[in-house]
Each structure stands twice: as structure tokens, then as C-alpha cells.
């Protein structure tokens, strides 16, 4: 089973080729739709395993939703009509760009962000949470910077540049001093080079304004990655 909530339409995923039996995803990440829709894709092997079960809770059973007698049964009730309109627009955008091009774009922009973060981390506390690039998400980058720098930086870029950075999830208990030492950069869905370079510029300005030790040339490193891919 694969959790693709934060990666669908961002990271390469080939369900059949990779032998995945069940995949779950949500609407609010790479599909660019507000939260509220969930998706379950399953293979024939998984369907056979379901049919062999003597008893299944209707809450978890996908059978009725996969083969409904009436349209509303896809959703277990009233259809989320406006979400479906949004999903239609999103899928049209994905089809127009092409999934291979979308995967390439996310790869390129992710590598630009990593280059910036690695440059900043040459001198100072900033480090990527995942050291191996092959294991990193192409949709979101989690960073460690030490408390209280994470919260201070998020606040500064929000107040002075209008950029919202994510909090660290699962890195420390909420309320603990260490909780303030992390942040995330989201780069999923309808994002492009000028959005990423603008966000990185805001972060670099925040590092300077707050006197957080960091290496120089983060934005330039990102620009080189983008330029090399053109």
C-alpha cells in the first residue's frame, strides 16, 4: 500500500509497474483542490483479497463506492460538487501540461530548493531533514535549523514578505522548546521557477535580518540549477 497524499502528481508514481495494490491520496496537495476529497485506488489482487474476507466494516469497505448503484454513493452521501468542479479544472491542467512534464518540473524545482538549503547550511545550523536526495520528497522539503530559529524565521517571512512556511510535523512535541527549530517549504502543484526563487529570496532575507548564521549564495545556487535545466 502506498500513501500518496503529499506526492500524487508531484513525485513519479507508477502503480501497476511497481506492483502497488492499494494507493490512497487526497485532493489538497499536488491536485491543487481544497481539502475534502480522498481517493483510493486498488488492484484486482486487492479486490480479490477483499472479496475473500467474510466480514468488512462498511466504513472501510470500498465495494459500494467502487461500484455504486447511484452517483451519490461514490461519496457516501451528498456529492462535494464544488470540489468536483475544482478537481475537473485541476485534471485539465495536468492533462494539458502532461504528467511527465509535471514530474520533471517538480524534480527541477525541488533540486533548486535543495541547492539553496545546502548553500545556507555550509555555515550555520540549517540542514535538510533527509540527507539522501534519492529519499527526499519532490513536493515538500523539511528542514532543521534549531530553536528558536525555525519559528522566528517563519514569523519574519510571513510578516515581511507574505510567504507562509510550514511548521515541522512530528519533529518535536508541540509546546516543547525544540518544536521551534523546524520549518517546511512546500513546492507542489501549480508552482514555477519565479515562485520558488521568490520564496527562497524571502527566506534568505529572513536569515540575514534575524542574524541566523548561514552560508551565502543560496538563491544563486537555486538559480544555477534552474538555468542548467533550461
What is each stretch, according to the model?
Residues 16-28:
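Conserved active-site segment immediately N-terminal to the catalytic lysine
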Residues 28-116, 230:
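Active-site C-terminal subdomain of aminotransferase-like
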Residues 97-105, 121-132, 168-169, 210-221:
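Flexible, glycine/charged-enriched surface loops at secondary-structure junctions
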Residues 177-230:
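PLP-dependent enzyme catalytic core of the Aspartate aminotransferase-like
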